[in-house]
Amino acid sequence: MSKTRMEKLKTLKTIAETLNQGHDIKATLDEVLKELLSLTNLQSGWIFLIEEDGSYTLAADAYLPPALSRKEKVLMCEGECYCLTKFNNGGLRKAANIMNCKRIESAENLHCFDTEGITHHATVPLEDGDRRFGLLNVAAAGKTMFDEEELHLLESVAFQIGTAIQRMRLSEYQQKNALLMERNRLAQELHDSVNQMLFSVSLTAKAAKTLTKDENLQQMIDFIQNLSQDALAEMKALIWQLRPGGLEKGLAEAIKSYGALIGLKIIFTQKGCPVLTDEQEHMLWRVVQEALNNCKKHAGTDTAYVSLTASLCHAELDIIDHGAGFRYEAHAGLPSLGIKGMKERAEKAGAKFWIESALGTGTKLSIRLPLKSRKGGAV
């Protein structure tokens, strides 16, 4: 067996082992891409995951030149390019040499960032049977052509990646489905048991008050009734959060409805129209719910301001109240498990999370979420 063939088999074996161990798509693609570049002595690479409508996400990248990594990789996250256009038109079915890279061309026109000698790249579709997931692009300084053997190796790796993406997506779907079923079950049990018991306590207290003229006893009964009413409201909010529904009429309506449920007036504003995936919308929804709960419990105000601003590449969500606020210093860490949970949820979705607050000035919570690039935008 030739040395070249042995090296190819070794590369495929290493890639396959990494993919077989992967459970998170982004983390696995990041690791595999770096391994591929190391094993093939290529310089730079990136992977686009592409939806049926042509929108795409920069799912992984490794060792991008400064020209492409500037400003949070903006040139990689927006607009069309030759390889994406060809993929979306159905003209890219196997590994191919791309004559030049439109994104590099755009970077060179800026005349201020280094492309590290990269002008061309090979592009390979990521597929599994009839399912098409995206593109694998690899490049090296001064390399304008990839020979047939190199392209065959890239095709083999791309097929492995496509198969792994399909497996991980299926596993992710099954896990989410199981989680939603469990949340629904818990919500139903809480509604049928604890919720009904709290309602009974409230009614019993109301009836008991009519049976006595003792003012002290009446005050105690009033306290029990008010406490049970508060607990009932908390339980309704918890059930709402557990159930997977709530977004049927959109994020804005869900936020307003939830505010009304817990007794908060919501001033909602929106600029732009972000294209959110189901996962991104669900993440924003859960973070807003937790933030509004905190506002209701701790801020001492009956109004919260929620704004959603969208640009081509990002969506920014701000939740503001002018209530009590709290002493917060970023270097000291987050002050509560609820806020830590919001931060973890946001960062898991690839978003940035930060909070501003001071005693007597209220609280502002912000999330900045990268969006999928839309088909047809300019590079």
UniProtKB/Swiss-Prot annotation:
Entry EC no(s): 2.7.13.3
GO cellular component terms attached to this protein's record: plasma membrane
UniProt keywords, alphabetically: ATP-binding, Kinase, Nucleotide-binding, Phosphoprotein, Transferase, Two-component regulatory system
Listed Gene3D superfamilies: 1.20.5.1930, 3.30.450.40, Histidine kinase-like ATPase, C-terminal domain
CDD domains: HATPase_UhpB-NarQ-NarX-like
Domain of life: Bacteria
Keyword Kinase: yes
Span of domain Histidine kinase: 185-373
Function field: Member of the two-component regulatory system YhcY/YhcZ. Probably activates YhcZ by phosphorylation.
Protein name listed in UniProt: Sensor histidine kinase YhcY
Organism: Bacillus subtilis (strain 168)
Gene, per the UniProt record: yhcY
